[in-house]
Amino acid sequence: MRACIVNYNTPRLACAAVLSLWKHTPGVRVTVLDNSDRLAIRDSEHWAGLVSSPLVEVIDNTKGQIVDWKEFLGRYPDREPSPGNDYGSAKHCYSVQWLSDYVGEPFLLMDSDVLVRRDVTEFFLHPDCAWVGQTGENVKKRFGYDIQKVQPFICFLNVPLLQRHGIRYFNGEYMWNLTSVRPNHRYDTGAWLLRACREAGLQGHELPIGDYIRHLGHGSWRGRPVADFLSLNRQLWC
């Protein structure tokens, strides 16, 4: 079993996420794409013992070695202004697609700011499904972004099945803020995946993700109370 995490300036949270995963489901291989521009995993004391584990692979993109974000955004000259997160949703979706192409196998996608509460093996037990997780409306519904999506906080992606059907997690024509053409810009993280799977006739499997994770969420990279969150949920990762 493999899990993949996209990290952006949250090394302490990402470390706790991995430890919580292993506490409840030992032996899962973990691949992390580090997109940090300030708090890199390689400089984090919290990762000192993790990076040497044979179960962990950290891919350093802190200098644009893998994905040059300036070049990436340059592909979308008519994009709308970013609402304060520098096109974070688009970058995250593209990072997930990069990881999918890189590992080429099914994996559990986890946000860097979730803590696993229980064994996640159930996510891997539906080989005929394109995804396993929970659908829901966009959290940006109050801004008119109401297209349904597969929640990205924790979900299983059956990469070989998606690849056979030509389905990609990232689609720049259906990614909010990358194009000014409505309604395409209303698609947030996981929304294109759900639409593409439905159009291809691929099934997903619903699981109540709140039973499996605790999520700091909503801009944790902005410096929300990380220490308090980790302290209150210490039993999940220590």
Language-model regions, residue ranges each:
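N-proximal low-complexity "stem/linker" segments adjacent to membrane-targeting elements
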Residues: 1-19
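Short, acidic, metal-binding catalytic loop of nucleotide-sugar glycosyltransferases
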Residues: 20-28
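Short beta-strand/loop segment that forms part of the nucleotide-sugar
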Residues: 27-39, 59-64
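Active-site-proximal specificity loops/subdomain of glycosyltransferases
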Residues: 43-102
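Short beta-strand-to-loop acidic/aromatic patch adjacent to the donor-nucleotide binding site
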Residues: 104-115
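Conserved donor-nucleotide/metal-binding helix-loop-beta segment in metal-dependent transferases, i.e.
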Residues: 118-144
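Short glycine- and hydrophobic/aromatic-rich loop-to-beta-strand nucleating segment
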Residues: 148-162
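Catalytic core and acceptor-binding pocket of nucleotide-sugar-dependent glycosyltransferases
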Residues: 154, 163-237
